[in-house]
Regions:
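Anion-binding and metal-coordination hotspots
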Residues: 1-368
Length: 368
């Protein structure tokens, strides 16, 4: 815990950090968010308040799933923060359906469901496609509230991406057909296998069918399958067990979008000058301490960013500017006279925003 917390709504997300060394007590293989195949990792759970300010961080073994980290956060909030009524905001990986049912008695949650679950609810006629609109809609099923919306901009973006992929695969098939015609001894089976692999990689195999016809690859778009695949483009569904009296649908939507602040903190930890990597440690307690210190630095950076927000300068640029402030020390015998250099220009503004004044007095320090 980094500071005293009085709120009852918290944002929570999980990330991983790969390790270059060996024999770390927490290292293990797991779902690697850094896309580093063959690397062991640690899993990090970050808890922030509703403004995105870090309040606690936990480190888990590298093979820990997102949902398995939730009980630890509940214990933290209940026992350390002494919060009786807890509302936790997390993505859909945090709260699988089975866990939502178990947690309903312990905490309130705001999360989301995937397209597979949405399709199931549509099939069971518990939801209707007409509810997915630019304006937020709400449905309550078995004391769980479902907040629905369709982002038209995202719908157009996905449709455009899919069209670009279809155009790309069409060009690749034409190139492959040209090669087959120019090389009579080349294998059509190999060519078909390569195109199939490309279709799967681009996730077009659900609605594009291919076959060999007279040493030429033919493809056809299954319009019905394409329509089904694109039906939920831009659509999403949030879920919560909060009462309407506690939060309306607009508030639920806004709080879920606030998760981006936690993601920003993770990027700051992993990709900026704070440098959580590389981890030159093996013991569990030291690894956790390393992540904790990095998280405290992230908290300080966030506060500095708030104080310096109207100076049109990044935190790193501000810190670099402050490194020019030095003390002048004059030694006379066994005595030392130290005078702080006065801040001017940008440094004066930076310190002023932090309500820090450098004394003009000359201090005498005697040494023995």
């Amino acid at each position: 815990m980094l500071h005293k917390v009085k709120a009852n709504l918290y944002l929570y997300d999980v990330t991983s950090s790969y390790l270059e060394g060996a024999n770390n007590e927490l290292a293990d293989y797991g779902y690697n968010r850094d896309k580093k195949k063959g690397k062991k990792q640690i899993v990090i759970g970050l808890l922030t308040n509703s403004e995105g300010m870090p309040v606690a961080v936990r480190v888990f073994k590298g093979n820990t799933s997102d949902s398995k980290t939730i009980p630890d956060q509940i214990n933290l909030l209940r026992n350390d923060f002494l919060i009786k009524k807890v509302t936790l905001v997390g993505d859909r990986a945090m709260f699988p359906q089975a866990q939502k049912d178990d947690l309903a008695e312990q905490i309130s949650y705001i999360s989301a469901i995937g397209k597979r679950q949405i399709k199931t609810l549509l099939k069971n006629e518990q939801l209707q496609m007409s509810l997915f609109d630019e304006d937020l809609q709400e449905v309550e099923i078995d004391q769980v509230r479902y907040i629905l919306r369709c982002n038209s901009h995202r719908t157009q973006e996905l449709a455009g991406n899919r069209a670009d992929k279809i155009k790309f695969i069409s060009t690749k098939i034409e190139e492959k057909n040209t090669y087959l015609q120019e090389h009579p001894r080349s294998s059509t089976d190999v060519a078909l296998k390569e195109v199939n692999a490309k279709l799967q990689k681009l996730k077009l195999d659900k609605f594009i069918d291919i076959e060999i016809d007279n040493r030429s690859i033919k493809y056809a778009i299954n319009e019905e399958s394409l329509k089904e695949e694109s039906k939920l483009d831009g659509c999403y569904c949030l879920v919560t067990n909060l009462d309407q009296a506690d939060a309306d649908k607009a508030t639920i939507h806004a709080r879920y979008k606030d998760l981006s602040m936690v993601e920003h903190s993770f990027r700051t930890m992993k990709q900026s000058h704070l440098e959580i990597r590389p981890v030159f440690l093996r013991r569990e307690d030291r690894t956790k301490a390393h992540v904790f210190v990095t998280m405290m630095a992230c908290m300080i950076e966030k506060k500095l960013s708030e104080y310096w927000s109207n100076l049109e300068i990044t935190v790193l640029e501000g810190l670099n500017a402050l490194t020019t402030l030095i003390n002048t020390t004059l030694s006379i015998g066994d005595s030392k006279l130290t005078k702080a250099v006065q801040a001017n220009g940008l440094c004066k503004k930076l310190l002023g925003k932090l309500d820090i004044n450098i004394t003009k007095e000359v201090k005498s320090v005697s040494t023995f």
